[in-house]
Amino acid sequence: MNKRRVKMRKEIRLSGFGGQGIILAGVILGRAAALYDNKEAVQTQSYGPEARGGASKSEVVISDEPIDFPKVIKPDILVCLSQQAYDKYKDDIKEGGVVLVDEDLVSTDKMPEVDVTMYKIPFTRIASEEIKLPIVANIVMLGALTRLTNIVSKESMEKAILDSVPKGTEEKNLLAFSKGYEVAKEL
């Protein structure tokens, strides 16, 4: 009997506003999948005309086969680090998807139209209070995302972070990743 292998295609949308490192987070996620987990990955991005404060979105498609369409249609995983992003994208998520929000920046009074698993984590507060560096909230988020979804391995993400962050910031970024990973263990 010939068994058909089930294809794995996961669509991830990371969203927030300019200056939060959304694009870098998408690049790191795609790099972890493609270079270190030996998966296929495509990363696309869009942002408003403002350098900081405007809407920002990074989408990553991860698959175990060649990716025939590089855009996210219905995300399996949605991350929102701003209220504007949550309000705009919450109803795009797939039934049974996973939503992560920064609980200090996003009110989830209005839930997505479909059943999802919602995680509310204070990414920015963890970065500010525990690492003393608010700019690494995106890396805290990647730690939680990795732990909660297993979309890529922890080791692959750590390698991709080291490849991607500015020289001299590696230790703080790995600490941020570790904090996010640990806080997700408690959920």
UniProtKB/Swiss-Prot annotation:
Record-listed E.C. numbers: 1.2.7.3
Enzyme class: oxidoreductase
Keyword Oxidoreductase assigned: yes
Catalytic activity: 2 oxidized [2Fe-2S]-[ferredoxin] + 2-oxoglutarate + CoA = succinyl-CoA + 2 reduced [2Fe-2S]-[ferredoxin] + CO2 + H(+)
Superkingdom, taxonomy of origin: Archaea
GO molecular function terms noted in the UniProt entry: 2-oxoglutarate synthase activity
Keywords: Oxidoreductase
Subunit structure: Heterotetramer of the KorA, KorB, KorC and KorD subunits.
Protein name stated in the entry: 2-oxoglutarate synthase subunit KorC
Gene label: korC
